[in-house]
Amino acid sequence: MFIWTKAPARGLGKASKILPKRDDTQKVFETTHHKQFHTATTSVRRSSSSAKERQRAERQQLTRLLKESPGKRDARNFLKQFDVPKKSKASITAKAKELVSENIHNDLASLRTGVNLGDLYKPTVFTREPLPEESYDAEKDEPVHLALVKLRQPQKLTDRTLGDIALTLSQMARLGLSTAVVLDCDEDTSTHSIEVKPEYGNMVREQALRLVAALEDYNEPGSLLVEDVLGYSPLDNDMPSTNQVRGGVEVQHTYLLFPPIDDGVIPVIAPFAYDENLKKVRVQADDVLLALVREFAGLGHSNGMESPRGSLHKTKRVVERPLLDRIIILDPLGGIPSENRADGAHVFVNLEAEYRDIKKELQQLSSKTSNGAGSPTSLSTGNPLSKFVEQEVVSLPGVQSENLASSAPVRHLKNLDVLERGLKLLPPSSSGLILTPMEAATKAIPDDARTTPSKNPLLHNLLTDKPMTSSSLPTSPTSRFLGSAAPNPATFLKKGIPLTMIPDPRVHGPWQPPSASNPSIELADDPRINFPKLVDLIDDSFQRKLHPKNYLDRIHGRVAGIIIAGDYEGGAICTWETPKSLQGATPPSVLTPDSPYWIPYLDKFAVLTSSQGSGGVSDIVWAALTRTCFPDGVVWRSRTSNPVNKWYQERSMGMWKLPGDQWTMFWTTEGIVGGWEQGKWGDVDDAKKRDMKRWDACIDVCSGIEPSWADGIQRDD
């Protein structure tokens, strides 16, 4: 009585069966399912073992290529997560000894009981290689990594685009990340009745079979349409709970999911469920996605609707449950919009620190749109070129103006909400990605040799666990050439880490120079700062010991603020520095950040070595530093031989080698070659006012910083 549909070409065993309809009518239908799939998983494994072996061989070839670049941190992180674990010879030998010991024990037991069956049940040889059946146990040690994919509006995709998406998903499987796809055929964001209307049911089934057929062409283990895995209960779920999703959608029959995924089959899940009367109902695809997340996270529970066959499978499901690494939403609208970025979208979202602010921004945008005060096209940053392109340039194929209909902000809000709720239930290493189906269909290896290869955001994210573009990079107005009429760039989301800024610019505004009403903070005495942990962070990041007393003496009275990411996984210390030529002069009574007496200086930027290159810690700290704490610019120096200088250069307005070639100065300040207004100088002679520009003050500051390391060696800071 459980429906699933599999294309007959893959030959995983078929059986026809006439069953009563779920609504207890007498109409019968024919359904295709696997023979005893819930218990006889071994036969399925045998039928797909050759395909799995080929996939494993292809993945080993790819990982071998990655291993040829051991200096690449991204490659090492990918191999650490997805490479096939190997059993050591010692473990195999220990297993053989265990089997020998067990055999001797059994012999002694047979003597004590007086039962002697001779050598009939004795193993033949224990001292050679492991027995053939043991090879599969070694294979089972390899975890199944999974990505849940929600595909919105597949009915608007051409067969070619759908095929290219299927190709991408099959390439992800070869790299070690299996997928399960949830279909979302809803045209809008309004709430629908749970009644399944015939035209809607037929449309969803047609689109599901289109996707299954496309996946069959590229994924050798095949694909499967699963329609009976979900149950629905009309219970009131307003009570807060981490175990229940709104809408009462629950995974009821896990044996319809786990074995196919284990064998490399890609299940396509329709947004249908069955209530307590076994009646088919329509449910929201977001609720289906959250129910699957909970099940794969080990938080699912049955309310008695599990079938007897399913209950038999439950005894093994903890062992066979895949590891959910990614939640992916393919939405024609693209990523989460941002009014503060020239490219129009958040490329990386640290949910722990940014979720509430982004949600509030989207809610305000949604209310403006619904009241007619604005339109979704205001998601652009007002770039004149974007407006011209919107009005004068014809949209590219696949870019539809209806993507930015009045419901767009609501849809973005729903995407943000479902990923926040889903990632909250998963380990911190899990991540989410929102992108357009067209981006997912990008071919990394084009059909035409004359076509330039393009990066596929899904494959790039799988290999690097990062967004296509670093969120800390500055964006130019021309980086979003198509204007707001185009879908937003992809958004990468992580559960992330909390971000602490002292003082908090979200409360007090950007950091200000010290004054009687705004005294400088003291790192060692401020109760909000764990100074020993801060010192440990600096020591670990710089790989040398800081001299705490000398350092505190040097920055005393000049600390602008401190940024702390997570539990001191990364951070930045900023100071206000005065050029040596102005020390001792009388400053004006009222000081502003744009003053020759107070140059905003990045004194320490540190990230734990264990967090470098992963988790976005560097990007999180840098974005807070340059966009929130010092939006008007900051200056810093780095030793000329520092390999991080390329990273600094990409995020700065410019760089300059200081005299002596030991240091390189960087800055994010606009107009650094300009001067200051007359009223900002105070008691300084006119000649110095004419001669000193911002440029001279910054060079003076960066050349005069004294290192504060415990080894006493005057080498690079």
Curated annotation (Swiss-Prot):
Entry keywords, A to Z: Acyltransferase, Amino-acid biosynthesis, Mitochondrion, Transferase, Transit peptide
Reactions this protein catalyses: L-glutamate + acetyl-CoA = N-acetyl-L-glutamate + CoA + H(+)
InterPro entries for the chain: AceGlu_kinase-like_sf, GlcNAc_Synth_fun, Vertebrate-like_GNAT_dom
Residues covered by region (Disordered): 35-70
Domain N-acetyltransferase: 518-691
Gene Ontology CC: mitochondrial matrix
Pfam families registered for this protein in UniProt: NAT (PF04768)
GO terms of biological process kind: L-arginine biosynthetic process; ornithine biosynthetic process
Biased composition (Low complexity): 39-50
Top-level division of the source organism's lineage: Eukaryota
MF-aspect GO terms: L-glutamate N-acetyltransferase activity
Major site of localization recorded for this protein: mitochondrion
PROSITE patterns: GNAT_NAGS
Transit peptide: 1-23
Cellular compartment(s): Mitochondrion
Family designation: Belongs to the acetyltransferase family.
Free-text function comment from the UniProt entry: N-acetylglutamate synthase involved in arginine biosynthesis.
Record's protein name: Amino-acid acetyltransferase, mitochondrial
Organism: Pyrenophora tritici-repentis (strain Pt-1C-BFP)
